[in-house]
C-alpha cells in the first residue's frame, strides 16, 4: 500500500505545474519559462550562425543549420505554391521551436525538478508541449492565420461562399454545408494542438513510469524508449509544421 501511495505521489509530483493564480485564469509559469528558453536558444543559435557564417567550408553547426533550412524551404516550395515571404520563416520557426520543446522530454525525468528544488521550487514541469495550453495556443495562432489568409485571398464574400456552397450546391442545403464546413474549420486547430499534446504527454508518462521501476529495469527500458522517442520528437514537430503549411495553402486556393 505504501509503494502504491509513494508511486502515486511521485507521478502526481511530476505532473504538477508551477502555477500563478487558480482556476481557468491560472498561468503555468514553468511552461512559459521553458517555451521562452527554447525560443531564445533557437534565435541565439541561428543568429550566431548567420553572423559568423562563412562562404568557405562551413563548420558542423553551420552545416546542420543549412541542412535544416534547405529541408524546410524545399518542403514549403513543394506544398505552398504561392509566393509568400511569411510562410518559409513561419514553417522554420514552428519546426525548430516544437522540436526543441519536444527534445526536453529526452532529459532524465528527475534532472530538471532536482535543479529547481535547489532554488526552493517544489513543482516544476519542464516539458511545455505536454501542457495542453501550449500546443493549443500554437494551434490557435495557426487558426487565426488560416482565417486571415482566407479573407486576404478570397474576401469576406468568398469566405462565406466557401462555407455555404459546398459540398451540396442546392440553396436549401446551404445551412447543412455551413455546419459541415464550420466543423471542419474548427477541427483543424483542435486536432493540430491535441495531436502534439497527446503524443508528448504519453511519452512523458512512459518515462515517469519507467523511473518508478528498479534501476536495472530502468536502464533496460529507458534507453530503447528514448531512442524510439527521438523519432516521435521529430515526427510531431514535422507533422505540426506540414499541417500548418497545408492549411495555409488551402486557405489561398480556390475550391
Curated annotation (Swiss-Prot):
Protein name as annotated: ATP synthase subunit a 2
GO biological process: proton motive force-driven plasma membrane ATP synthesis
Function as written in the Swiss-Prot or TrEMBL entry: Key component of the proton channel; it plays a direct role in the translocation of protons across the membrane.
Predominant cellular place of this UniProt entry's protein: membrane
Quaternary structure and partners: F-type ATPases have 2 components, CF(1) - the catalytic core - and CF(0) - the membrane proton channel. CF(1) has five subunits: alpha(3), beta(3), gamma(1), delta(1), epsilon(1). CF(0) has three main subunits: a(1), b(2) and c(9-12). The alpha and beta chains form an alternating ring which encloses part of the gamma chain. CF(1) is attached to CF(0) by a central stalk formed by the gamma and epsilon chains, while a peripheral stalk is formed by the delta and b chains.
Annotated GO MF terms: proton-transporting ATP synthase activity, rotational mechanism
SUPFAM superfamilies linked: F1F0 ATP synthase subunit A
Transmembrane spans: 26-46, 86-106, 131-151, 205-225, 230-250
Topology relative to the membrane: Multi-pass membrane protein
Localization in the cell: Cell inner membrane
Record family assignment: Belongs to the ATPase A chain family.
This protein's UniProt keywords: ATP synthesis, Cell inner membrane, Cell membrane, CF(0), Hydrogen ion transport, Ion transport, Membrane, Transmembrane, Transmembrane helix, Transport
Species: Photobacterium profundum (strain SS9)
Keyword Transit peptide in annotation: no
Pfam families the UniProt entry points to: ATP-synt_A
GO cellular component, one term: plasma membrane
Annotated PROSITE patterns: ATPASE_A
Gene3D superfamilies documented for this protein: ATP synthase, F0 complex, subunit A
Amino acid at each position: 500500500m505504501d509503494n502504491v501511495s509513494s508511486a502515486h505521489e511521485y507521478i502526481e509530483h511530476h505532473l504538477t505545474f508551477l502555477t500563478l493564480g487558480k482556476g481557468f485564469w491560472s498561468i503555468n509559469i514553468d511552461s512559459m519559462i521553458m517555451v521562452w528558453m527554447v525560443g531564445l536558444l533557437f534565435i541565439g543559435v541561428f543568429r550566431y550562425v548567420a553572423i559568423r557564417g562563412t562562404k568557405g567550408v562551413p563548420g558542423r553547426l553551420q552545416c546542420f543549420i543549412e541542412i535544416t533550412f534547405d529541408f524546410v524551404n524545399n518542403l514549403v516550395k513543394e506544398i505552398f505554391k504561392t509566393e509568400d515571404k511569411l510562410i518559409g520563416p513561419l514553417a522554420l520557426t514552428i519546426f525548430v521551436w516544437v522540436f526543441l520543446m519536444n527534445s526536453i522530454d529526452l532529459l532524465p525525468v528527475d534532472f530538471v525538478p532536482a535543479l529547481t528544488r535547489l532554488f526552493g521550487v517544489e513543482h516544476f514541469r519542464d516539458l511545455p508541449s505536454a501542457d495542453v495550453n501550449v500546443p493549443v495556443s500554437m494551434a490557435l495562432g495557426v487558426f487565426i492565420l488560416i482565417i486571415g489568409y482566407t479573407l486576404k485571398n478570397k474576401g469576406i464574400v468568398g469566405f462565406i461562399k466557401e462555407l455555404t456552397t459546398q459540398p451540396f450546391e442546392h440553396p436549401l442545403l446551404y445551412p447543412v454545408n455551413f455546419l459541415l464546413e464550420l466543423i471542419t474549420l474548427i477541427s483543424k486547430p483542435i486536432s493540430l494542438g491535441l495531436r502534439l499534446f497527446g503524443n508528448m504527454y504519453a511519452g512523458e508518462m512512459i518515462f515517469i513510469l519507467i523511473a518508478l521501476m528498479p534501476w536495472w529495469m530502468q536502464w533496460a527500458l529507458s534507453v530503447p524508449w528514448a531512442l524510439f522517442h527521438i523519432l516521435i520528437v521529430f515526427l510531431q514537430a514535422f507533422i505540426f509544421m506540414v499541417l500548418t503549411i497545408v492549411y495555409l495553402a488551402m486557405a489561398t486556393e480556390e475550391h
